[in-house]
Amino acid sequence: KKKIPLSGGMAGGSADAAAALVACDALWRIGLGREELDVLAARLGADVTFALHGGTAIGTGRGERLTPALISGQYHWVFAVSDEGLSTPAVYAECDRLREGREVQAPTVAEDLMAALRRGDSVAVGKAMRNDLQVASISLRPQLELVLETGLSFGALGGIVSGSGPTCAFLARDEEQALDIAAALSGSGMCSSVLHATGPAHGARVVDSGTSGSILSPR
């Protein structure tokens, strides 16, 4: 049952597409391998391939070329959700406008982040969190900056706009702190709802629900 809004910057549509691919393959007994599903996923959208695999990965190209990343431990996340979505094309267009006339460096893998993930160091992960689209999202929705400041003031280890927004993602030290941050954000009146989740998460897969199988979306 979907709990995240459309245009929330959380790849919910991509997760549904991945689940639909797995469901159709199972329902029609096609027997596609992961490589064949990956090809179909890449044609559907940039994040669909990752939603098929889940876990933690480095995405290049449009996001469809994945390299699994080593990670230790479990991470607790709090998501401040807005009912009013942000258009992904509009955010990318705003990013282009803000960068116009400036030299843009090619993206690189943040080695400090990868090392922190390998160690299971949530404090270091929080410090290394970054989203290059965040400036554009805040430019279109200035109140997101206040949401981020509020989450960090309640003790979050790190906070970023998720994807193209407007959802804001906060990393907590543990479940207890995540619930405290979620309660504080819920009472702030700055977001329509707050979600607590843990990661890494599985990709889309068939699960046993008793007498019949069902498809679990990673979202």
Pin down the residues of each PLM region.
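Phosphate-handling active-site elements
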Residues: 23-44, 175-187
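DPxDG-like acidic metal-binding loop motif
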Residues: 8-35, 50-52
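Conserved glycine-rich beta-strand-loop-beta hairpin in the small C-terminal domain of fold type I
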Residues: 166-168
